[in-house]
Amino acid sequence: MASQPPQPPSGQPDTQYEEYQSEVITETTNRPTPAADVYEITPTNDVMDDRYEHEHDDYESGAMYETVRTWSPQSRPELVRIASVFSRIDSHPDVAPTTEDGGQLNRRDTLAGVKIGDPVLDPTKPEFDFYKWARMFTHVMEKEGIKRNRTGVMFRNLTVLGSGSAVQYQDTFLSPFAAPFRPGELCGKGRNPEKVILHDFNGAIREGELLMVLGRPGSGCSTFLKAICGELHGLQKKKESIIHYNGVSQHTFKKELRGEAVYSAEDEHHFPHLTVGQTLEFAAAARTPSKRVLGLSRKDFSTHLARVMMSVFGLSHTYNTKVGDDYVRGVSGGERKRVSIAEIALSGAPICCWDNSTRGLDSATALEFTKALKIGSQVGGITQCLAIYQASQAIYDIFDKVIVLYEGRQIFFGPTRIAKQYFEEMGWYCPPRQTTADFLTSVTNPKERIAKEGYENRVPRTAVEFERYWKQSQNNKLLLADMDRFEAEYPLEEGHLEKLRETHGQAQAKHTASKSPYRISVPMQVKLCTVRAYQRLWGDKSSTIATNISQIMMALIIGSLFFDTPQTTDGFFAKGSVIFFAILLNGLMSITEINGLCKATDPIVPNAQRPIVVKHVNFAFYHAYSEALAGIVADIPIKFLLALVFNIIIYFLGGLERSAAKFFIFFLFTFITILTMSAIFRTLAAATKTIPQALALAGVMILALVIYTGFTLQPSYMHPWFKWILYINPIAYAYEALLVNEVHGNRYRCATPIPPYGSGTNFACAVAGAVPGEMSVSGDAWVESSYDYSYAHIWRNLGILLGFLAFFYFVYLVVSELNLSSASSAEFLVFRRGHLPKNFQGSKDEEAAAGGVMHPNDPARLPPTNTNGAAGETAPGGSTVAVIPPQKDIFTWRNVTYDITIKGEPRRLLDNISGWVRPGTLTALMGVSGAGKTTLLDALAQRTTMGVITGDMLVNGRPLDSSFQRKTGYVQQQDLHLETTTVREALRFSADLRQPKSVSRKEKYEYVEDVIKMLSMEDFSEAVVGNPGEGLNVEQRKLLTIGVELAAKPQLLLFLDEPTSGLDSQSSWSIVTFLRKLADNGQAVLSTIHQPSGILFEQFDRLLFLAKGGRTVYFGDIGKNSETLLNYFETHGAEPCGPSENPAEYMLNIVGAGPSGKSKIDWPAVWKESEESRHVQQELDRIQSETSKRNEGHGQSAEKEPGEFAMPFTSQLYCVTTRVFQQYWRTPSYIWGKLLLGLTSALFIGFSFFLQNSSMAGLQNSLFSIFMLTTIFSSLVQQIMPRFVTQRDLFEVRERPSRAYSWKVFLLANIIVEIPYQILLGIIAWASLFYPTFGAHLSSERQGILLLYCVQFFIFASTFAQMIIAGLPDAETAGGIATTMFGLMVTFNGVLQKPNALPGFWRFMWRVSPITYTVGGLAATSLHSREVKCAQNELAIFDPPSGATCAQYLQKLVEAGAPGKLYNPMSTSQCQYCPLSSGDQFLGGSEIHWSDRWRNFGIGWAYIVFNIFATVALYYLIRVRKSSGRPNRIISVITYHLSQFGTYCRAFITGRKEKCPRKREQIGKIY
């Protein structure tokens, strides 16, 4: 029955409204001026530390002058400078006298009650006090007349619209074929309906106020914060929406003062190779004002502020530590979050919006962060809005105002102290010990809120009813009145804007536009970003050095390949090849500037650093084009040095002419080409949104650039439909210039005169450009005849290259500035077609789903009791959890110690930890940050892969066996799942492989359905996991992670690592209460817990609490209302816990958690000597004794199904292969990307080399067309490896430790699934390339052989990619190695340098290159028995002796077996001799023979088999043995000998004759 429209309660005291009205009037009418506001507001909040109140008292009463402490010689210069600034403050007229020893007593600042030299002002000292420092610094700024902007924000009728549906359908490989049958979707109808995200918000936030934003995930908190800062990016505000900042419209404010309102996103984006100090000093320098206290230098000012923020947020110890990311080792996740917070704080913005910035922080650190915000607001007048999950009461009390959101609707806005009363008067019940923030959020959750008795039919239920109630309330009327006063005080006019402009202009550097939002000029921005680029290079110098070394190695290889090239006509092709290689390698080495994979590890990768640049542009640190220009400037010297070394090697080693003038021209063109191609790749990366887009375009572009350089396809043989590419190809102009530069003015001895016995004018050289009767050929004539090149074009080409360079640099800078924002869209679920639940609604009525309003005495809401017999209790969703199998095993651990070695020094992470987990108990594992909670969990779950673990870990008194890991469930903190699978499929996969084979599949799937009901996942059981924002949300992913482990039916216990991390309080409550019910039904559970509220904490039975260093603080029962736990701490000297205080936060506080936390008591030592600790050891003895007796009674064969895995090898292979096939099928972007790459590349090659004639150049072009097909190899490999890594990450992080299936199954499944798609790709490439190139005249036998070779080549590519990536950590590293190996394979395949021209020491490479046999088989099949018809410029034309015919004159040559053919045998002049007569003769020069076609085909399959075996071997040696903790023998031996080699080399260099230790026993230890 629908409820009546809710009305505000009447007849009750309305004191809250009177207080609110009084407060509003006081704030608006008696508000102090900005200057007074800075110095008169005092920290009156109850949660502020007592020291702040004492400091304020000290300020009011004044204090006596004292002798100043001497500054430490180690103090940083900027701190001494700041101190000297403070010493000149005239806040008190008195000056202390001079002491007897001549030292002057400095003036004391009575404003903050500190003296110069006091360590409370030194951020490098532990005594540093941020509150005193902030008041002192603000006072100094005031005395110097330095202004800073202060502004509030008012929003009226704020409505934000987005596009997107609540549900989408998953695309598959066949989706493009089905699209024509869905015309509605094809035309876009209904695909992106307009969606209201925020509905008609109103509010005013005065300067210096803190606003807490509360709401469940998806309620619009992030959108609200973005709207306040004007960073909607794709979302739209309604025209009626008004947002202004003290009278300045948002449009004007964001245009001129962008950095004055900043938004801190939930995710962190930083350059991982920068240190914390460099990151924060950069932020401080970018926002350093032009006018600083008493002329402090920019460097001193920015460094000091960075140090202050590092001290405030507990980062001082990380100054020289890399920030890091998921791939680069650096600071911890919590510290990285604090770096983001400090970066925002250094922006100096008067309006800051923080989106869940306390995520990943423990409660003590979160409280410290909030206190710092409060100080910034009180002292600096900063207006701050913070969306926060799981806020403690102490955090809530710091805020001034709160806004509550419910499904995008505003249901409250006002002072924090009246919010709870507002909802209680509405009719909602707040349970004891529930924090106010949790209560306010819980009223928006139908499953959690509790109605007071008598209010069941009066309280609002839906979001619309809550909103209606709010708009009719007296609080809303007062708010609207306050907004009217705000607008009257700050009308929309230019007055306040001019004040903001004036203050902003005071902070701007010289030569900065007055209306620019930036504080520093463009040259200063470029300089700052350039310095940062070099810092990043230095931070990742190993990668930079490795890249440069690989380039130099390639130069050595290519140069040596053409070493000692003859200076004859036989060297023409080699000269063209080496110049082609040189210009190509120089030009394409910059392609790495695209492939950063969004990791920001490369300082020159635009796409990788885009999220960081977008953030910094929004903070008004710098223009995007300034960062782009800085990347160019920083890169030029590095490219110059690399180009110099590279080109010196390849030029002089490759046999090019040793002329200074020609070398410098060569170097000039190659260097300009490097810069031009770099500009092109940068532009391509900046113009695209994603890395795959950029790489796809780059692949096609590179193919076009290579083919139309002029070497692989000569200009005269280019077809008109693609010849235009030649004229826009920068490499083509460089190639022409280098080739004519090399041969200009030179004559080359003829190597093949026709006939060799000719004299006078009766012979000719068989090369283009030859003149009859001359034994040498002009280089200029050769290039003009062969390529239509001219030396006169050389400087013209330089001008064209410089034009290309300038054009693409300009476009790059423009695109970098314009192509920054990314569209925002609403979150949605993704379903497979035909599997959308019938009752699914985009925004369903949760009230109906919850079954009405809960009552205070509702059993579903009361904390569950710890009774193992409650088998029929219901989970939150109403379904039973009685399907949990009964458990009797007890897991114990005693004196567990974990030691690792870091940089050669031992470090103890866990120190003698003991405990146990019984069936039916829920045990919490807590501790301060860095205490080793996850480390202990990994150690107990047998998931560590390094270090030494000692101690006893037993199950029923027995040591752990090989089945332990598959009998336990481990819910990891990271929700790792395959993005293409559905929820039900993920659960079934776990059940299939981890439940014993004795259980039928039907029973397994029935149990999966029970798990789905237990976790209330029915509504999204057929939803695809997807990615965040496009798939399951955070809570749903966490439920799936738990469900996957439950589906395995863990027989022993369930481990959980931070199951509530990143969730809101209501979602956390759901998870923990579900764990409680699992424990009540007999499941043993051990869980680390993050920021638990008092109510959550009460759900646990026992607690294991750790201090830093992995030392035990407490292990034992928690007790009712935490009495047992609190009694222990209070008995041993801790202050009593307050009645309303959260016990979890209480414990963290007393042990000294948080950045500035300290404890006077050594709690681990107290525990070690306590009676409770001795009782733990006695209980462990008793458990072990009892279980040992039980074991003896049951014998030693309790294990019914021993073994590492639950299912046999064949079952594993079937399940895993099926899942990988599903993943590929449901990833059409990957499959179609692969197929389109092959199709477009093959068609482009085919029509570029369309039906080449039978001339010598035509045959060479046909061979090049086959060669160009092999260049697809690298792009294919780069596509395959990331897919392999995705599967491997999931396997190694979650599925292998759980013993779901074998690593051999993982490898075989991935190899098998790639093969069908590679076969299809081979068929497509065969049809697209060989028909356009050779026509349909080839016999069916030859066409079949070509098809077989194409299929084989693509299968080889997939197995090669898997071999390379198998043992390497990431796709980037493997990609670099694969590219190098591919370069060697194509270099030595006999096409670019004939095998007989290879130096002797490189000939073996021609034989081991797999491409040799692929090219050989394809070329032999295509060109066998093809007649050669020389073009006019290829003929040797000469006159026979007088009276002789051409046939008579050449009879001796023909009898000697010459391969050529005479075209006019009876002529007596102008004999035309073609050096070749058949394609087999042409191929013979490359040692390609028709008779070897099947041999080559067999060798190709041998390489494929080798790749498969090498994949297995490398994975085992590098990753399996490493993960098992056993030493890798081969790597150890290599490392040992390398280390001894280094010792011997050092001895040789220093002149000490030390013998290299080679004792057998030393090496034997390794084996």
Swiss-Prot record:
Pfam families per record: ABC2_membrane (PF01061), ABC2_membrane_7 (PF19055), ABC_tran (PF00005), ABC_trans_N (PF14510), PDR_CDR (PF06422)
Keywords: ATP-binding, Cell membrane, Glycoprotein, Membrane, Nucleotide-binding, Repeat, Transmembrane, Transmembrane helix, Transport
GO annotation, cellular component aspect: plasma membrane
Domain ABC transporter per the UniProt entry, residue ranges: 167-432, 891-1134
One Gene Ontology molecular-function label: ATP hydrolysis activity
Extent of the signal sequence: none
Positions of ATP binding: 927-934
Compositional bias ranges of the Polar residues kind: 22-32
Membrane topology: Multi-pass membrane protein
Location, primary (coarse class): membrane
Compositional bias of kind Pro residues: 1-11
TM region positions: 543-563, 571-591, 636-656, 661-681, 691-711, 798-818, 1231-1251, 1257-1277, 1305-1325, 1345-1365, 1372-1392, 1498-1518
InterPro entries, per database record: AAA+_ATPase (IPR003593), ABC2_TM (IPR013525), ABC_trans_N (IPR029481), ABC_transporter-like_ATP-bd (IPR003439), ABC_transporter-like_CS (IPR017871), ABCG_dom (IPR043926), ABCG_PDR_1 (IPR034001), ABCG_PDR_2 (IPR034003)
Reaction(s) catalysed by this chain's protein: voriconazole(in) + ATP + H2O = voriconazole(out) + ADP + phosphate + H(+); fluconazole(in) + ATP + H2O = fluconazole(out) + ADP + phosphate + H(+); (R)-miconazole(in) + ATP + H2O = (R)-miconazole(out) + ADP + phosphate + H(+); (S)-miconazole(in) + ATP + H2O = (S)-miconazole(out) + ADP + phosphate + H(+)
Subcellular location(s) per record: Cell membrane
Chain positions covered by the region annotation Disordered: 1-37, 1172-1202
SMART domains xrefs: AAA (SM00382)
Record-stated family: Belongs to the ABC transporter superfamily. ABCG family. PDR (TC 3.A.1.205) subfamily.
Role summary: Pleiotropic ABC efflux transporter that may be involved in the modulation susceptibility to a wide range of unrelated cytotoxic compounds.
Descriptive protein name: ABC multidrug transporter MDR1
Organism, as annotated: Trichophyton tonsurans (strain CBS 112818) (Scalp ringworm fungus)
Lineage: Eukaryota, Fungi, Dikarya, Ascomycota, Pezizomycotina
